[in-house]
Amino acid sequence: MQVFEGKLNGKGLKIGIIVSRFNEFITQKLLAGALDCLTRHEVENTNIDVIWVPGAFEIPLVAKRAVHKDYDAIICLGAVIRGATPHFDYVAAEVAKGIAAVGLEANKPVIFGVLTTDTIEQAIERAGTKAGNKGWEAALAAIEMANLFKKV
Protein backbone atom coordinates (compact mmCIF):
# COMPACT_ATOMS: atom_id res chain seq x y z
CA MET A 1 0.00 0.00 0.00
CA GLN A 2 1.22 3.48 -0.83
CA VAL A 3 0.18 6.51 1.17
CA PHE A 4 0.62 9.97 -0.27
CA GLU A 5 0.59 13.17 1.73
CA GLY A 6 2.03 16.62 1.31
CA LYS A 7 4.84 17.69 3.57
CA LEU A 8 4.67 20.99 5.43
CA ASN A 9 7.92 22.41 4.11
CA GLY A 10 7.60 25.29 1.68
CA LYS A 11 11.22 25.42 0.56
CA GLY A 12 11.34 26.09 -3.17
CA LEU A 13 7.60 26.68 -3.53
CA LYS A 14 6.23 29.68 -5.44
CA ILE A 15 2.98 30.97 -3.95
CA GLY A 16 0.49 33.53 -5.24
CA ILE A 17 -1.86 35.20 -2.76
CA ILE A 18 -4.97 37.01 -4.01
CA VAL A 19 -6.46 39.34 -1.40
CA SER A 20 -9.70 41.30 -1.43
CA ARG A 21 -9.38 44.98 -0.52
CA PHE A 22 -13.03 45.11 0.62
CA ASN A 23 -13.16 44.61 4.41
CA GLU A 24 -9.43 45.32 4.40
CA PHE A 25 -9.32 45.64 8.18
CA ILE A 26 -9.98 41.88 8.18
CA THR A 27 -8.17 40.80 5.01
CA GLN A 28 -4.99 42.57 6.09
CA LYS A 29 -4.93 40.28 9.16
CA LEU A 30 -5.60 37.21 7.02
CA LEU A 31 -2.72 38.20 4.76
CA ALA A 32 -0.42 38.73 7.75
CA GLY A 33 -1.30 35.24 9.01
CA ALA A 34 -0.68 33.68 5.60
CA LEU A 35 2.68 35.43 5.20
CA ASP A 36 3.74 34.41 8.70
CA CYS A 37 2.86 30.77 7.99
CA LEU A 38 4.66 30.74 4.65
CA THR A 39 7.78 32.30 6.15
CA ARG A 40 7.82 29.90 9.11
CA HIS A 41 7.56 26.99 6.68
CA GLU A 42 10.56 28.16 4.62
CA VAL A 43 8.86 29.77 1.63
CA GLU A 44 11.26 32.49 0.53
CA ASN A 45 9.87 36.03 0.48
CA THR A 46 10.99 36.37 -3.15
CA ASN A 47 8.76 33.39 -4.03
CA ILE A 48 5.58 35.03 -2.73
CA ASP A 49 3.44 37.39 -4.81
CA VAL A 50 0.52 39.32 -3.31
CA ILE A 51 -2.21 40.43 -5.70
CA TRP A 52 -4.85 42.86 -4.43
CA VAL A 53 -8.34 42.87 -5.97
CA PRO A 54 -11.25 45.25 -5.24
CA GLY A 55 -13.58 42.70 -3.64
CA ALA A 56 -14.13 39.00 -3.04
CA PHE A 57 -16.22 38.67 -6.20
CA GLU A 58 -13.14 39.49 -8.31
CA ILE A 59 -10.97 36.79 -6.71
CA PRO A 60 -11.98 33.88 -9.02
CA LEU A 61 -11.37 35.90 -12.19
CA VAL A 62 -7.87 36.91 -11.11
CA ALA A 63 -7.20 33.37 -9.84
CA LYS A 64 -8.10 32.08 -13.31
CA ARG A 65 -5.32 34.25 -14.78
CA ALA A 66 -2.86 33.51 -11.97
CA VAL A 67 -3.04 29.72 -12.42
CA HIS A 68 -1.24 30.17 -15.74
CA LYS A 69 1.78 31.66 -13.97
CA ASP A 70 4.47 29.52 -12.36
CA TYR A 71 2.81 29.29 -8.93
CA ASP A 72 2.76 25.96 -7.12
CA ALA A 73 -0.39 27.09 -5.30
CA ILE A 74 -2.66 30.10 -5.07
CA ILE A 75 -4.21 31.30 -1.82
CA CYS A 76 -7.46 33.29 -2.04
CA LEU A 77 -8.20 35.56 0.92
CA GLY A 78 -11.28 37.68 1.52
CA ALA A 79 -14.04 38.52 3.96
CA VAL A 80 -17.71 38.51 3.03
CA ILE A 81 -19.82 39.67 5.97
CA ARG A 82 -23.61 39.35 5.99
CA GLY A 83 -25.55 42.59 5.77
CA ALA A 84 -29.24 43.45 5.61
CA THR A 85 -29.73 42.40 1.97
CA PRO A 86 -29.36 39.09 0.08
CA HIS A 87 -26.14 40.41 -1.52
CA PHE A 88 -24.09 38.31 0.95
CA ASP A 89 -25.68 35.07 -0.26
CA TYR A 90 -24.92 35.78 -3.91
CA VAL A 91 -21.34 36.92 -3.34
CA ALA A 92 -20.42 34.15 -0.88
CA ALA A 93 -21.83 31.40 -3.10
CA GLU A 94 -20.30 32.67 -6.34
CA VAL A 95 -16.88 33.26 -4.81
CA ALA A 96 -16.79 29.75 -3.34
CA LYS A 97 -17.96 28.16 -6.60
CA GLY A 98 -15.61 30.29 -8.67
CA ILE A 99 -12.51 29.48 -6.63
CA ALA A 100 -13.32 25.76 -6.66
CA ALA A 101 -13.92 25.82 -10.42
CA VAL A 102 -10.58 27.51 -11.10
CA GLY A 103 -8.67 24.89 -9.14
CA LEU A 104 -10.49 22.00 -10.78
CA GLU A 105 -10.09 23.42 -14.27
CA ALA A 106 -6.40 24.28 -13.85
CA ASN A 107 -5.50 21.14 -11.89
CA LYS A 108 -3.59 23.29 -9.44
CA PRO A 109 -4.14 23.98 -5.71
CA VAL A 110 -6.32 27.07 -5.39
CA ILE A 111 -7.02 27.46 -1.69
CA PHE A 112 -10.25 28.95 -0.32
CA GLY A 113 -9.39 31.36 2.49
CA VAL A 114 -12.44 33.59 2.20
CA LEU A 115 -14.34 34.21 5.41
CA THR A 116 -18.12 34.11 5.06
CA THR A 117 -19.49 35.29 8.39
CA ASP A 118 -22.75 36.58 9.79
CA THR A 119 -21.10 39.34 11.83
CA ILE A 120 -18.02 41.52 11.94
CA GLU A 121 -17.21 39.95 15.31
CA GLN A 122 -17.09 36.48 13.75
CA ALA A 123 -14.75 37.76 11.04
CA ILE A 124 -12.46 39.35 13.63
CA GLU A 125 -12.38 36.09 15.62
CA ARG A 126 -11.31 34.15 12.51
CA ALA A 127 -8.66 36.69 11.52
CA GLY A 128 -6.37 36.09 14.46
CA THR A 129 -8.22 36.19 17.77
CA LYS A 130 -10.42 33.47 19.33
CA ALA A 131 -10.76 31.17 16.32
CA GLY A 132 -7.17 31.35 15.06
CA ASN A 133 -6.20 32.92 11.76
CA LYS A 134 -7.82 31.43 8.67
CA GLY A 135 -5.14 33.08 6.52
CA TRP A 136 -2.53 31.00 8.33
CA GLU A 137 -4.63 27.86 7.84
CA ALA A 138 -5.08 28.58 4.12
CA ALA A 139 -1.32 29.03 3.70
CA LEU A 140 -0.64 25.74 5.47
CA ALA A 141 -3.13 24.00 3.19
CA ALA A 142 -1.40 25.57 0.17
CA ILE A 143 1.99 24.21 1.24
CA GLU A 144 0.60 20.75 1.89
CA MET A 145 -1.35 20.61 -1.37
CA ALA A 146 1.53 21.97 -3.47
CA ASN A 147 3.80 19.25 -2.11
CA LEU A 148 1.12 16.59 -2.53
CA PHE A 149 0.65 17.57 -6.18
CA LYS A 150 4.35 16.87 -6.76
CA LYS A 151 3.79 13.26 -5.66
CA VAL A 152 0.41 12.33 -7.12
From Swiss-Prot:
Family: Belongs to the DMRL synthase family.
Catalytic machinery residues: H87
InterPro entries, sorted: LS, LS/RS, LS/RS_sf
Name of the gene this protein is made from: ribH
Pathway assigned to this chain's UniProt record: Cofactor biosynthesis; riboflavin biosynthesis; riboflavin from 2-hydroxy-3-oxobutyl phosphate and 5-amino-6-(D-ribitylamino)uracil: step 1/2
Organism encoding this protein: Carboxydothermus hydrogenoformans (strain ATCC BAA-161 / DSM 6008 / Z-2901)
GO biological processes: riboflavin biosynthetic process
Binding site for (2S)-2-hydroxy-3-oxobutyl phosphate: A84, T85, R126
NCBIfam families assigned: lumazine-synth, PRK00061.1-4
Keywords associated with the record: Riboflavin biosynthesis, Transferase
Record EC number: 2.5.1.78
Catalysed reactions, as listed in the record: (2S)-2-hydroxy-3-oxobutyl phosphate + 5-amino-6-(D-ribitylamino)uracil = 6,7-dimethyl-8-(1-D-ribityl)lumazine + phosphate + 2 H2O + H(+)
Keyword RNA-binding assigned: no
Classification via PANTHER family: 6,7-DIMETHYL-8-RIBITYLLUMAZINE SYNTHASE, 6,7-DIMETHYL-8-RIBITYLLUMAZINE SYNTHASE DMRL SYNTHASE LUMAZINE SYNTHASE
Protein name: 6,7-dimethyl-8-ribityllumazine synthase
One annotated GO molecular function: 6,7-dimethyl-8-ribityllumazine synthase activity
GO CC annotation, single: cytosol
Domain of life (superkingdom): Bacteria
Stated role: Catalyzes the formation of 6,7-dimethyl-8-ribityllumazine by condensation of 5-amino-6-(D-ribitylamino)uracil with 3,4-dihydroxy-2-butanone 4-phosphate. This is the penultimate step in the biosynthesis of riboflavin.
Name of a matching Pfam family: DMRL_synthase
Coiled-coil regions listed: none
Residue sites binding 5-amino-6-(D-ribitylamino)uracil per the record: F22, A56, F57, E58, A79, V80, I81, F112
